[in-house]
């Protein structure tokens, strides 16, 4: 990410003004859409959860909607980059990558079924483990095996990477052995005592109540992060405006009937709310904070190089702070007008 990307956030997060003001013109509407689904669980579990939702979307839009699965988050990002994925459910970190590298744009946000404004990253151990808190974990880490998340996962990688590791000046490589996997795989590995500790999140643990209740009973949460914003729904910017309008209308109105509410509840959600690329600002700040920590602790860099890199990162953080201040001011004015 660079300063140009940050500077353009406030504009790219909204619909193109030039598009809104330009004369109407004929567009070729997409005849089918591929919906990317990140691999938080096995495809076997995800497919029945998502099929009713995608079928409803297909009926509303009047075009075929195909589920697009990949073995990791990067597969969905790359799919969008090469126009193989049209819409996708991402975590915040993978959405940031899609926006920056794959011509993506956030337009909606998930809301937890209980109405929570987001979810939490957690560290889990087996219920029989003597480890009960973060201090226990840090003290014994060199003797433990660690199940880290997908490198593009917000709750499985970025958030614990900052709050657990960077803030305590340690690394995931400090463990006896570290492996990377999705949330479901990590949870089952801890339940089966194949790894000692792993990352996860509260949404996925809730899903285990249905998909693997006996395994859930084997888990113990030893750390919980600050709140993470709800997951973004992202489309390709170069979709036709006609298709975007239909997609947006579907998401903003879905979940009003008992049948639709039941479909969303199976996914762990309540009705969606509107969003934009601006919801990624806190995640951008977190990624930059983590990068700053890494530069400062890098023994391979001389002091001059460290200063240059940290100065560049700080400039990006300052840009994001100014953007946040502007958004807060705009929000205050909007509330005053109302």
Swiss-Prot record:
Keywords, sorted A to Z: Periplasm, Phosphonate transport, Signal, Transport
Pfam families: Phosphonate-bd (PF12974)
Localisation per UniProt entry: Periplasm
Signal peptide from the UniProt entry: 1-26
Record's keyword annotation contains Transport: yes
Oligomer and partners: The complex is composed of two ATP-binding proteins (PhnC), two transmembrane proteins (PhnE) and a solute-binding protein (PhnD).
Name of this chain's protein: Phosphonates-binding periplasmic protein
Upper classification of the organism: Bacteria, Pseudomonadati, Pseudomonadota, Gammaproteobacteria, Enterobacterales
